[in-house]
Structure formats: C-alpha cells, structure tokens
C-alpha cells in the first residue's frame, strides 16, 4: 500500500492537475512510523499539488492511536463520523469536543447516519444512497450474492 501511494505521490507532483486521492483502510498505514509519517506529509502537502486527500477507516481508534493519525484528523478541513464503538466515542469526544448528546448519537447511529464536521461546525446527517450506489458500496455478503445472482440471470437472458 505504501509503495503504491508513494508512486501515486510521485505522479501527482510531476503532473499537476486537480485530483482526488482516496486511501481506504488508512489505519494500516498508521501502524508503522514510516508510513504514518508519509501519510502526514501527504496530508500536509497535497493541496499544494491540487490534490484532495480522503482517508477512510472503519475503526477510528486504530487511526487515532497514532500521533500522526491524530494530526491528520485535526488538520482535515472536513470529517465524517459514522457509528462508533463506545470506547472510540470517548476518544473522539475529546478530539472533536462533542456534546454529551453527540456522544450518545455517535454510539447509536443506524446505518447511513453520522456527524459531519466542517471547521468548527458539526451537524447530524442522513446519507441516502441510490440503488446503484448501494450496489457499489455494500459490504453485506448476502446483498453481494444477490447482486451476483441477478447479474448471472441477466447474462442468461
């Protein structure tokens, strides 16, 4: 993952144009000092090269457990937090200065609801995905099998 990102970063710096880099499972990079420092440097310098950076992780505690991870989150212009474990809510409550009500909500949000942060402002949001979007992003094994079966049936006709 680090090698691929490093290669992408080299391309971004030599061929400047507006782009968005999405790093899924970013917590994996935060486990090691070298890759965490690389991500932090990337986050700090991306804008200079017309690059938007989005980091995604399911377990924010792994990300926030790193000094560099905390710095990346703190320096981000926007954050989106979906349902979190109670222990993660405690950490996030301190970092994001959450109210008691926001802490409760964050621990109990249903799928598609979360807190969106832009600067000092934070609001409760509901994300509604279209059927096409849901098909692309679902991680539900049963839904994935149904999609595969439907696609196979469509190919048969």
PLM region descriptions:
Residues 1-105, 131:
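Conserved P-loop NTPase motor cores
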Residues 3-14, 108-157:
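Conserved P-loop NTPase motor module
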């Amino acid at each position: 993952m680090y090698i691929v990102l490093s290669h992408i970063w080299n391309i971004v710096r030599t061929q400047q144009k507006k782009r968005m880099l999405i790093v899924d499972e970013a917590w994996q990079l935060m486990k090691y000092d070298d890759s965490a420092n690389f991500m932090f440097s990337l986050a700090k310098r991306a804008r200079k090269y017309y690059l938007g950076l989005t980091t995604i992780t399911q377990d924010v505690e792994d990300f926030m457990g790193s000094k560099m991870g905390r710095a990346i989150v703190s320096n981000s212009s926007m954050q989106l937090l979906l349902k979190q474990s109670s222990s993660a809510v405690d950490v996030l409550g301190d970092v994001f200065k959450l109210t008691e009500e926001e802490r409760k909500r964050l621990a109990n949000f249903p799928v598609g609801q979360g807190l969106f942060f832009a600067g000092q402002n934070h609001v409760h949001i509901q994300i509604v995905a279209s059927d096409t979007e849901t098909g692309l992003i679902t991680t539900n094994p049963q839904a994935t099998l149904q999609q595969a079966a439907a696609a196979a049936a469509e190919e048969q006709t």
